[in-house]
Curated annotation (Swiss-Prot):
<dbReference type="Pfam" id="PF00300">
    <property type="entry name" value="His_Phos_1"/>
</dbReference>
<dbReference type="GO" id="GO:0004619">
    <property type="term" value="F:phosphoglycerate mutase activity"/>
</dbReference>
<feature type="binding site">
    <location>
        <begin position="160"/>
        <end position="161"/>
    </location>
    <ligand>
        <name>substrate</name>
    </ligand>
</feature>
<keyword id="KW-0324">Glycolysis</keyword>
<feature type="binding site">
    <location>
        <begin position="116"/>
        <end position="117"/>
    </location>
    <ligand>
        <name>substrate</name>
    </ligand>
</feature>
<feature type="binding site">
    <location>
        <begin position="10"/>
        <end position="17"/>
    </location>
    <ligand>
        <name>substrate</name>
    </ligand>
</feature>
<feature type="site" description="Transition state stabilizer">
    <location>
        <position position="159"/>
    </location>
</feature>
<comment type="subunit">
    <text>Homodimer.</text>
</comment>
<dbReference type="GO" id="GO:0006096">
    <property type="term" value="P:glycolytic process"/>
</dbReference>
<comment type="function">
    <text>Catalyzes the interconversion of 2-phosphoglycerate and 3-phosphoglycerate.</text>
</comment>
<dbReference type="InterPro" id="IPR005952">
    <property type="entry name" value="Phosphogly_mut1"/>
</dbReference>
<dbReference type="InterPro" id="IPR029033">
    <property type="entry name" value="His_PPase_superfam"/>
</dbReference>
<dbReference type="GO" id="GO:0006094">
    <property type="term" value="P:gluconeogenesis"/>
</dbReference>
<dbReference type="InterPro" id="IPR013078">
    <property type="entry name" value="His_Pase_superF_clade-1"/>
</dbReference>
<keyword id="KW-0312">Gluconeogenesis</keyword>
<comment type="pathway">
    <text>Carbohydrate degradation; glycolysis; pyruvate from D-glyceraldehyde 3-phosphate: step 3/5.</text>
</comment>
<feature type="binding site">
    <location>
        <begin position="89"/>
        <end position="92"/>
    </location>
    <ligand>
        <name>substrate</name>
    </ligand>
</feature>
Length: 207
């Protein structure tokens, strides 16, 4: 029986996470803490005996750097890796680069909360979580899932909202449930899938 392993990891803390800025498709790198989180994720996976056949990441530096650091810890720096903007973070449009407190002053706390926590209301010029799902899910179905179902042990390093989109489908969550799902930076979530692509087991390696 093939393993059908899929491990999802949110990138380590970025410079803009630290500064409380909306990041989206902007491209800051990891902080020192983010580097440490990524290395720790790789060490955790190695300690538990994980070996991978293929990796996927976004077109953004913070996710790519996280993946590179994990692969170094795993001793798998030559792993075949695909980078694609379909796995990018949700695009925050006009909010991108703004301090979250400044955004609240400009648009009001209630409106900013709606943009951040509603499923289908996008910020000006940006994406809702529903929009993010619309670009992330086809990529998962067409590119990532076939690898997993072939028994290729698959590692994905991406972003809070692009991973939420995948988790929503994997775990069959409602919009209300996925909006409450928090993903820690550098915390692997380990899925094993059945032959029909449903989830056989899920283990969160946070902490």
């Amino acid at each position: 029986m093939s393993d059908r392993l899929l491990v999802l990891v949110r990138h380590g803390q970025s410079d803009w996470n630290l500064k409380n800025l909306f990041t989206g498709w902007k491209d800051p790198d990891l902080t020192e803490q983010g580097v440490a989180e990524a290395k720790a994720a790789g060490q955790k996976l190695k300690t538990q005996g994980f070996v991978f056949d293929v990796a996927f990441t976004s077109a953004l530096t913070r996710a790519q750097h996280t993946l590179d650091l994990m692969l170094t810890e795993l001793g798998q720096t030559g792993l075949p890796t695909t980078r694609n903007l379909a796995l990018n973070e949700r695009d925050y449009g006009e909010l991108s680069g703004l301090n979250k407190d400044d955004a609240r002053k400009k648009w009001g706390e209630e409106q900013v909360l709606i943009w951040r926590r509603s499923y289908d209301v996008p910020p000006p010029g940006g994406e809702s979580l529903k929009d993010t799902l619309a670009r992330t899910l086809p990529y998962y179905v067409q590119e990532i899932l076939p690898c997993v179902l072939r028994g290729e042990r698959t590692l994905v390093a991406a972003h809070g909202n692009s991973l939420r989109a995948l988790i929503m489908v994997l775990e069959k969550l409602t919009p209300e449930q996925i909006l409450k799902r928090e993903l820690g930076t550098g915390a692997p979530v380990v899925y094993r899938l059945n032959a029909d692509a449903t989830v056989a087991s899920v283990v969160d390696l946070a902490g």
